[in-house]
Amino acid sequence: MALFRNLGPFHTTAIGHGEMPLTIENNRGHDVGIETLHASLDAGCRHIDTAWAYYTPGEEEQTGEKLVREALDSWKGPREEVTVATKVGLRRAWEGDKPVWPRDGKPEHLIEYGKQSAMALGVDSIDLLYLHRHDPEVPYNESCEGIKALLDQGVAQWAGVSNVSIEQ
């Protein structure tokens, strides 16, 4: 039996499934990704974490969010019990032969990415949306205003931040 906790207004499992390794470089393929998410859900997991930037650089963007949508659409369990969190504010690129994670905290881009995330996930409103990482080129409060705009527009129900320091 899974242990449940409150995450803001959501009553969800204390342990969630981080989707990143299923869609970034060196992943084991689409079908294995679907099977893996189904196995987690079947085992009682009710929280999935993904991000706009979970894809292999140079390939289709947002494959992580799209994989989560497909897994939830094809899963035979109670979809309404599953909380999905996603993040915006990072992109993917290559520097030589090394994958990198450029930051993009411009409010207008965060708003665009948030709307794209809702579409990729197939939802009217994202359960929980995070600012993925602070962009040092953009004042922190400006990035937060972009996230707040997504809340105000109903694109996301709740918001948070990820990978930040106490000072930020």
Regions of interest found by a model, annotated:
Residues 25, 56-58, 94, 136-139:
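Glycine/Thr-rich phosphate-binding loops of Rossmann-like dinucleotide-binding domains
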Residues 95-168:
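Glycine/proline-rich, positively charged
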Residues 21, 52-54, 88-92, 132-135, ...:
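Active-site-proximal loop/turn and secondary-structure-junction residues that shape catalytic pockets
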Residues 1-83:
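N-terminal binding-site loop/beta-alpha segment at the start of enzyme catalytic domains
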Residues 67-71, 83, 87, 109, ...:
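Generic beta-strand or strand-like secondary-structure segments
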Residues 17-19, 65, 90, 155, ...:
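Gly/Ser/Thr-rich helix-start
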Residues 7-25, 85-101, 125, 130:
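N-terminal small/glycine-rich loop or linker at the start of catalytic domains
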Residues 47-51, 83-86, 125-130, 160-161:
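Short beta-strand segments at enzyme active-site cores
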